[in-house]
């Protein structure tokens, strides 16, 4: 159903006055966006109003559900107990690609990871940028991307290739030049519907709404984390606030590096650089030549993934398992295997 212009005006006014949409209203707004039933001016106004008012978990969950339905999986979903590791971006910290390193490390430790990612949001180099630079074919056919999982235990879903419904909104989002609700929806709409997820947020006010959105979407297990010092992943700079989703319930905790047998380190120890620099860091780190801080921040975040995946029941054990894998260089082997599996020569 498409609402009348007056109805949309009233709803916009509701948002501008601090109101929150019901699940049904948020659903209708997203459906209208995808159907191009709103003018660019109306769409821009709604995006700005949502950004100004702040995030609501019910709205996010409803919008994500619509996007999921609009992006059906073009091949059979694997039944491997999948997990995803990603962040909302927007922390502006210019760290190296931590969540990308975590995906390959977690795979080397026994998790099965379907990483859903894109090009840079705020950092200098996004996950897609660095992986493409290391030779991954980002636009491999969907069946090829999925079929890589049994052997490699990790694959990469380049978001623009999997969400054709969002193509028409891309020019407007780009012209606005600011982060919108769509930046938060990206981590919620992995096309392979992972059973578990570690989701990093750049500000602590996103912890509860993102956890609520995951709960409303039926996520089995998840950890939503805001990194000490302002990262959108667990940090070594101090205790990290988290929301843990398990069996339909969300609980709040704090997890410090010391809890996992790791040492605190400043954010400067995690700095990245340009594309070439970040590629070098990722290759050295995954092949056993990373610095202590690089190894330990990846181990910290990998521990969360291993718990979500059910591979480890204890965060500390998970961190130590990740450190052992990194020291052996086995995560780099996973990346090499995935690069070969996604090669154009492998396309059928």
From Swiss-Prot:
Cofactor: Mg(2+)
Catalytic activity, EC: 2.4.2.18
UniProt xrefs under SUPFAM superfamilies: Nucleoside phosphorylase/phosphoribosyltransferase catalytic domain (SSF52418), Nucleoside phosphorylase/phosphoribosyltransferase N-terminal domain (SSF47648)
Tree of life domain: Bacteria
Coiled-coil region list: none
Job of this protein: Catalyzes the transfer of the phosphoribosyl group of 5-phosphorylribose-1-pyrophosphate (PRPP) to anthranilate to yield N-(5'-phosphoribosyl)-anthranilate (PRA).
Name of the protein this chain belongs to: Anthranilate phosphoribosyltransferase
Organism: Synechococcus sp. (strain WH7803)
Classification of source organism: Bacteria, Bacillati, Cyanobacteriota, Cyanophyceae, Synechococcales
